[in-house]
Amino acid sequence: MVKKIKEKSSLDKFFPIHSQTSKEDKIFLLNTIKLLNLNLSTYNYLEIGSYLGGSLTPFIMDKKCKKILSIDKRNLKLSDERGENYDYKNIPEKKMFLNFRKNGLKIDKIKTFNGKIKNLKKRGAKYDLVFIDGEHTDHNCYEDFLYSLNFIKKNSIIIFHDSSVIYKAISLIFIYLNKEKIPYSFIKKSESLMSAIFFGKYIKMKFNKIYGKIESTKKYFNSSRNFILLSQANNKLKVKLRWSKFFKRKYPYKY
């Protein structure tokens, strides 16, 4: 299904709906689809945090993808580790399906669950690929990962978006997997917000050939730590600046 992406128009074909993923993030997803296509005759996909459905579209298009489960806590106002707030109150599930129909995409293989994966009953299909892009807090990301383990196959991949924001959750995941003696490989894509954990037969893949340049785990953790500290400081400053507007003739910054 997926060939090497050379032009933006080619990328837009697979991602016709707006999403919060960059060009490099999208290419990472397409390369993962290519990896699955090379190793499996069919596969199932689970996504946590679908928003408008923008990251679901290449999986809808892929004939080898037989089942899709979209899990999301809709109609809520959420925040992340940076102190950023996101309002999803006006993004109902039906708006996502409307986006699919507008782009001529069939939705018969998609099922949705409005809530958290921890409340999903352990029954039915197992999944080859999970994309965790829900609430970007360390607690929620770690929780999503732990409960995702109930729904994955022995040979599977779990992808994380906004990896710099949830780097502490990733470090906790390492501790858990090492304690439980579960073999795995981890990569963080350079110049992208994507990272992934590979299980089973995918552990020994040549990731540089599949995804391109990979960032060292040490560099990833160090840069993420600095990013979060700077983001938190900037957000605190914004709050103080907003409060200062109430006071006339006062210097707007407070340290």
Predicted regions and their residues:
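Polybasic, low-complexity association/targeting segments
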Residues: 1-5
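S-adenosylmethionine/decaboxylated-SAM
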Residues: 7-14, 34-255
